[in-house]
């Protein structure tokens, strides 16, 4: 998509059977946000009801003609469908429209490509793009491959498609190796962070203000520009919790309704940061429409990833946009504002308690000259009692598994327990 020119696009919303908790109108509004985030200019849109999806076009023949006519009238350069089109459907629609046909996945990929900043992020986007292109490549060359089968009847089109397939699959192999190397480095970095103390991951629906809240919690003066999928690469900063305890706070990629599985897989490195965290802060935009549906989308995604059982806190961000005296729309959520700082101290306290949910108690006897280790206990755990006896320091407290592993040499087996 030509992002710099504000390419005019026509959007097609669809009311399909079994679409889920989002209404077609809401989903179309979100598609419009995605298009604008990709640098496009929405010149028009329509909402179609599809009782029985057409295998050839997804929509009915008459509906397709109406879409093509309206897109041409508005001089749209591309038509974007709020669904995942099959390669055959995309090709047939392009033939009728004589202009680009994109689906929801292609649009999200375009946004991802625009916002990927790190080498790892760019590699993951490139891999997802090739994975998306491969089945469409087959359909693109389908006419050439129908030149007949058998020896002596294979046409040049069949040779070309096989060559293109090989090149793309070879590129996938290269990308996979590069991503795996970066993934290994990130794994080492995670292990080092675990040694340093608590880790907390911010998750949430895209554009919920995760990056702004991350900056506010960590004292960063530049929260960045609010936009969909502003963060594709995990960002790690240090934050201080009540009592002087330190935590590493990780900003992660946002979720979205009907996020294609191939994109979830492409960003597994980002999601591994959530998996390794001691606690999760689920950030939601309290002023956004359909707040409950957005929260449910994130919770459902976490469940699919096997992360629903992690200790978590629900932070209802952008509370400064609520009317005075207006109560939280979701029970159990904490009202905060990254912009004004309201509620951040209470949130820090809740983060500390959530992260400590799986801590273990310890009772250790340290050498007298253990200043560095004591400081480590203070920053990444909690000290309940400290006594100096002769040339020894007796410490009772609690902490995360990484800290207790460090302290085992100073304790008898029964003195470290859950």
Q: What is the role of each PLM region?
A:
Residues 28-37, 68-73, 84-99, 244-246, ...:
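Conserved C-terminal guanine-recognition region of P-loop GTPase G domains, centered on the G4
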Residues 105-109, 228-229, 338-341:
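Short, acidic/turn-prone active-site loops that include or flank metal/cofactor-
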Residues 106-128:
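Short alpha-helix plus adjacent loop in nuclease-associated cores
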Residues 1-110, 416-418:
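N-terminal accessory targeting/assembly segments
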Residues 17-23, 53-57, 115-120, 159-160, ...:
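Flexible beta-alpha connector loops of hexameric P-loop NTPases
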Residues 186, 191-198, 216-248, 256-269, ...:
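Switch I (effector-binding) loop of TRAFAC-class P-loop GTPase G-domains
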Residues 1-12, 23, 32, 131, ...:
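C-terminal-of-GTPase-core extension/linker across diverse P-loop GTPases
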